[in-house]
A protein has these predicted regions:
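Alpha/beta-hydrolase active-site loop
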Residues: 109, 182-205, 270-276
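Alpha/beta-hydrolase fold nucleophile elbow
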Residues: 207-219
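Bacterial N-terminal signal peptides
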Residues: 13-24
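Glycine-rich nucleophile elbow surrounding the catalytic serine of serine-hydrolase chemistry
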Residues: 218-228
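Alpha/beta-hydrolase-fold catalytic nucleophile elbow
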Residues: 162, 217, 232, 243-246, ...
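Substrate-access "cap/lid" subdomains that shape
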Residues: 202, 227-228, 236, 245-369, ...
Length: 535
């Protein structure tokens, strides 16, 4: 019996040891919890990522009430309060969008995330609010490469946000305008962004941030968003610096109700305003345009709305949130008087290589003539080539220049009307994953956030990422990206037009494709400022 008892005892000991080895107790592996912070909606905690530096992250903080049910297609409302302590240790669901994958999607998506090393302290650190890209139709704020840890280690409080996308974020419709106190519709995603900035102003001090030193920055449609916020009277005073990375400003804007210019016909085949476009989309699955149709639309599930018909989200000039096209408002000096960084990548258009080719030289020139009218020939001469390969290259270069570089230059030149300085960059480091594409659209993101794969990135790439992350943080800190140990970055002026070339060897340049941009300036003025003949 004694031997049998001892045998059983050792079996139990062995089993317990195995359990501890393979299934450690939660307290042994869980990340430490931050101190309890108080925000306007209640108390919350986050996770401590690095106890030594105090680096912490707060995930999934609601900055507005869920825009569901009757709140669909309405301006965001104040977030509801909660009892007890909210554990902000999980990212929220991503906004509804047409994409495959396992990421949980929800209409209840108005959440933000905060990275900081000063939670609960009166540190008054500079704040940076990241607005993701994705054509206003896809994306979310907590993609891995947007991790804010590197910025936090630079002494910045980094905030990333989600906002409504696609038809849920940008649908303009006569019935929606009729029920609005301002008589407008569309742009709900931009209103979400403004609500997030209002939340930051009221609450970021609890995370060690300075509500009087807020930088907004974004890439692609996020850069477009920064441009919109920079000229919107609704966002004035909510930020103090702005960074526009590859802002997509080409043919991306429509008026609310009035017939639009050739820019809209290019993508829609009509001169209709945003409301009419929204009505056509809604009429695919709901009859009528009045309040009854709106009731039916609000009863549809988010998935039905996103999947039932393709809605091309766009910026709507509504006269309330957005009084005009951002590029033209910059040119008139009507933007916020805050320091700005504006830049592009060397080969933006190569990202869109599948969409910009032409079967023949004639077809390529016809496309330009349809958009630019009598100026199409001048534009076509900028992009020679006859073979399929040459025409693809011409299309990619045209995309780089007209979609990104020329509008960016217009905004940079518009900064001469205000007191604040502007800085231009051009990211030139080729993509390691797709070297044949050069430095395409969005390639700079992992460098800005310093989130390159440490196992595969070269020492030179890691150094470039660290330098860019420091430049961005320094700009957020002071409004000037120059500091000891950083490359000399001259401000953009109409006389010199200098910019920084971001590559393994960081250099300065001047007058980036100025002659090409001059031609595109003249051509685009004809497009955007004159309605088509007979309309």
């Amino acid at each position: 019996m004694n031997k049998q008892y001892q045998s059983r005892r050792w079996c139990w000991v062995y089993a317990i040891v195995c359990l501890l080895l393979f299934f450690p107790l939660p307290t042994q592996c869980a990340e430490p919890i931050t101190p309890v912070l108080q925000v306007q909606s209640g108390k919350l905690t986050g996770l401590v990522l690095d106890p030594g530096s105090g680096l912490s992250v707060f995930r999934g903080i609601p900055y507005a009430a869920p825009p569901v049910g009757d709140l669909r297609w309405r301006p965001p409302r104040t977030p509801t309060t909660w009892e007890g302590v909210r554990a902000c240790n999980q990212f929220s669901a991503i906004p509804w969008q047409r994409r495959t994958g396992t990421s949980k999607k929800s209409e209840d998506c108005l959440y933000l995330n905060v990275w900081t090393t000063a939670a609960g302290k009166e540190a008054r650190l500079p704040v940076m609010v990241w607005i993701h890209g994705g054509g206003l139709n896809k994306g979310w704020g907590h993609i891995g490469k947007y991790d804010g840890s590197a910025f936090a280690r630079q002494g910045v409080v980094l905030v990333s946000i989600n906002y409504r996308l696609g038809p849920l974020g940008y649908l303009a419709h006569p019935a929606l305008s009729a029920e609005s106190d301002q008589g407008v519709s569309g742009n709900y995603g931009f209103l979400d962004q403004i609500a997030s900035l209002e939340w930051v102003r009221k609450n970021i001090a609890a995370f060690g941030g300075d509500p009087d030193n807020v930088t907004i920055f974004g890439e692609s449609a996020g850069g477009t968003s920064v441009a919109v916020l920079s000229v919107s009277p609704r966002a004035r005073g909510l930020f103090h610096r702005a960074i526009l990375q590859s802002p997509w400003m080409f043919g991306f804007t429509s008026s609310l109700a009035e017939p639009n210019t050739v820019a809209l016909k290019r993508s829609t085949g009509s001169f209709s305003g945003a409301e009419e476009l929204g009505s056509r989309w809604a009429n695919k699955f709901v009859a009528g345009e009045g309040a009854a149709a709106l009731t039916q639309l609000r009863k549809m599930s988010a998935q039905e709305l996103v999947d039932a018909g393709s809605y091309d989200a766009r910026v709507t000039v509504d006269g309330w949130l957005l009084p005009g096209r951002p590029v033209e408002l910059f040119a008139q000096g009507k933007q916020a008087d805050v320091p700005m960084m504006i830049g592009t990548t060397r080969n933006e258009g190569n990202y869109f290589i599948r969409y910009v080719g032409s079967k023949s030289r004639t077809e390529f020139e016809e496309k330009l003539n349809r958009f630019y009218g009598h100026a199409g020939g001048d534009v076509a001469r900028l992009y020679p080539g006859d073979s399929a390969q040459e025409l693809t290259g011409a299309g990619c270069l045209f995309c780089t220049d007209s979609w990104f570089l020329q509008p960016s230059r217009r905004m940079l030149q518009g900064m001469r009307h205000v007191k604040s300085a502007a800085y231009q960059y051009m990211f030139a480091r080729p993509s390691k994953s797709y070297p044949k594409l050069g430095a395409p659209h969005a390639v700079e993101l992992a460098y800005v956030f310093d989130t390159l794969n440490e196992k595969t990135a070269s020492a030179q790439d890691r150094q470039l990422a660290q330098t860019m992350n420091r430049c961005w943080a320094q700009f957020a800190r002071t409004g000037n990206p120059n500091a000891a140990g950083l490359p000399t970055w001259p401000a953009y002026t109409m006389e010199q037009r200098q910019y920084l070339v971001l590559d393994h060897e960081i250099t300065q340049g001047a007058r980036l494709r100025d002659k090409v941009c001059d031609v595109l300036d003249r051509a685009s003025q004809d497009v955007y400022n004159k309605p088509p003949a007979g309309k």
